[in-house]
Design a protein with these regions (language model features):
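Canonical Radical SAM [4Fe-4S] cluster-binding loop centered on the CxxxCxxC motif
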Residues: 1-12
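Small-residue (G/A/S/T)-rich helix-start motifs and N-terminal tracts that mark the onset
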Residues: 10-15, 19-28
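Conserved SAM/AdoMet-binding glycine-rich loop
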Residues: 23-137
Length: 137
């Protein structure tokens, strides 16, 4: 499979689009990408999904924000804290685990280990006990 490089849109552009959608009656935003948790790394030099969410929760008219596809290595403590802080952000994480064996994960060129995945899940559960975690194995 061939994939291109990750490309993020500027926070202000996404917020402007969300405001326009809200003005037209949209109530829920679904942020989706091959790996949404990597948002902003290409533009800002660091994972910035938490910063984007902080801006999107201020958009009048938007009731829910759902985010799809979080890879474990980019689920930062700050992202978890931001998701836990706002009722508008759905407590739902779609995190492709793909495998629980470290050697197979290494052969698949994954950037995480089983132990790191468990640590992230524990942190999510600590901050958002009612969070739904969906995965593919």
């Amino acid at each position: 499979m061939i994939r291109g490089h990750f490309r993020s849109r500027k926070i202000e552009d996404i917020v402007e689009e969300a405001e326009n959608l809200a003005k037209n009656g949209v109530k829920e935003l679904i942020l989706i990408a091959q790996d949404t948790s990597r948002y902003g790394k290409d533009l800002y030099g660091e994972y910035s999904l938490d910063k984007l969410l902080e801006k999107l929760v201020t958009v009048d008219g938007i009731k829910w924000i759902r985010v799809h596809y979080f890879y474990p290595e980019a689920i930062t403590d700050s992202l978890i804290d931001t998701m836990a802080k706002y009722d508008k952000i759905c407590n739902y994480i779609d995190m492709p685990v793909q495998h629980g064996n470290n050697e197979i994960l290494r052969r698949m060129a994954r950037r995480t280990t089983q132990e790191q995945m468990v640590e992230r899940i524990n942190k999510i559960r600590e901050k958002m006990p009612d969070c739904t975690i969906r995965t593919s194995i």
